[in-house]
């Protein structure tokens, strides 16, 4: 299995809870931001016809087709194929791009009729993130202690009301990982936050990551 730097268990969770519904033998799939190939490998094991795509193939560890593409380009979908993929995956990618809505529009262009896209991104709506912003004015996983290439936080409310309609997409399924807590917080903090989550109102209180299953509005 290729090495990955995403939260431990996230790929397995997506595999078990999402890909089981959409990945099938012969399904044409593209993995955006493939990195070393952790998700592309899972798609391959499901029997999908997989294309991997990232800024470069450096470190890509699989014997699969790979296309080098810059996701900040306004029409990167044209390099991969329009309306041909039944399954698009982008695991922890959208937070790295300069224009999330443009990225989503390209995903819509990639989708074949009836296809779905599976995206994950840090949950900046979760309770620890809300406390961090309240106390410091900084966004969890995106401050000076976080990943330096995280530049575009995705808030669920904005995604649902603004980003997706503007991109021509709609939400089919929304999951959170982990479902009952937090991996990125210290154990003592995570315990307190889990207790507080029972009384604090709001969407997406638990979980370090959003998982979105999207489909075209057309």
Q: Which residues fall in each region the model found?
A:
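Short N-terminal helix/helix-N-cap motif within the alpha/beta-hydrolase-1
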Residues: 98-102, 129
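Acceptor-substrate binding/catalytic loop of class I
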Residues: 140-159
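Short conserved AdoMet
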Residues: 24, 98, 112
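A SAM-dependent methyltransferase catalytic signature shared across enzymes that methylate proteins
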Residues: 159-175
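Conserved class I S-adenosyl-L-methionine
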Residues: 119-140
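A short His-aromatic
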Residues: 92-96
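Conserved N-terminal segment of class I S-adenosyl-L-methionine
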Residues: 1-83, 87-91, 101-104, 119-121, ...
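A short glycine-rich, Lys/Arg-flanked "PGG" loop and its adjoining helix->strand segment in the class I
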Residues: 102-113
